[in-house]
Design a protein with these regions (language model features):
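Cysteine-nucleophile amide-bond enzymes
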Residues: 1-238
């Protein structure tokens, strides 16, 4: 487990959105995707062919939660070493992130979502997945594309254990909010079938047609004509 929790050498963040920029725009129920810098992050990014290796969900300061240091915590996540915990939004300051928002949640469903997530604090991480994840931190692991999602779904399957995206998917499952359901047609109607939460990965919230991508820079009346560009004509190399 310690091996997977070590940072990858050469990781460079190109984040343009700080925690302070996110705070005025983030809402309860928003899913925060993170481009992580640990070995376990590298494994998940390979298996999902995605930038996003981790997901946390925003419960807000009104939840009254604190992190392990006693500081106010606004996010809930499943951590490989600590299980399901509450953390501060500041933890991911400087990381590449994406904000995914469920739309038109009722107040009752939003509260059910929050209650489900808060009740999950203390659950253990599904450590059995580590056996698979360790193998895929090495260069060019020989895993066919069609098997990658199934590999992430391996593990104990116990209700007391979770990984980051399955924790969140399970909570949305409780209120029947779609992420990437299977859709079939029956009698000229579209019927939605819930996919088991263990099959979800962080990138699914990004590509889901039922989550809005929120970019604070654009949300605050962005106008490209107001940008003051450098007078130098040569592009920078960073």
């Amino acid at each position: 487990m310690q091996y997977l929790d070590e940072p990858v050498l050469g990781y460079h963040s190109f984040s343009t959105t700080t925690a302070d920029v996110l705070k005025p725009w983030i809402q309860q129920g928003d899913v925060l995707l993170i481009d992580g810098n640990l070995r376990i992050s590298l494994a998940i990014k390979y298996l999902t062919q995605s930038t996003w290796s981790h997901a946390a969900i925003y419960v807000g300061p009104e939840s009254g939660l604190t992190d392990e240091y006693g500081n106010p915590a606004e996010l809930i996540e499943a951590d490989a070493g600590k299980g399901v915990i509450a953390v501060s939004l500041n933890k991911y300051d400087g990381f590449n992130t994406r904000l995914c928002r469920p739309v038109k949640l009722t107040n009752v469903d939003r509260q059910t979502l929050m209650d489900t997530l808060i009740a999950s604090i203390g659950r253990q991480y599904d450590i059995k997945n580590f056996i698979d994840l360790i193998r895929f931190t090495f260069p060019q692991p020989p895993v066919p594309q069609k098997w990658r999602r199934r590999m992430l779904a391996l593990g104990s399957g116990e209700p007391t254990r979770a990984i980051c995206s399955t924790l969140i998917a399970e909570a949305f499952e409780q209120i029947q909010y779609p992420i990437l359901p299977t859709v079939t047609r029956e009698n000229a109607k579209e019927i939605f079938h819930i996919r088991h939460h263990s099959l979800y990965t962080p990138r699914d919230f990004d590509i889901s047609p039922y989550f809005e991508i929120v970019k604070p820079t654009l949300a605050k009346d962005f106008n490209y004509r107001n940008i003051e560009w450098s007078k130098h004509n040569q592009p920078t190399d960073f």
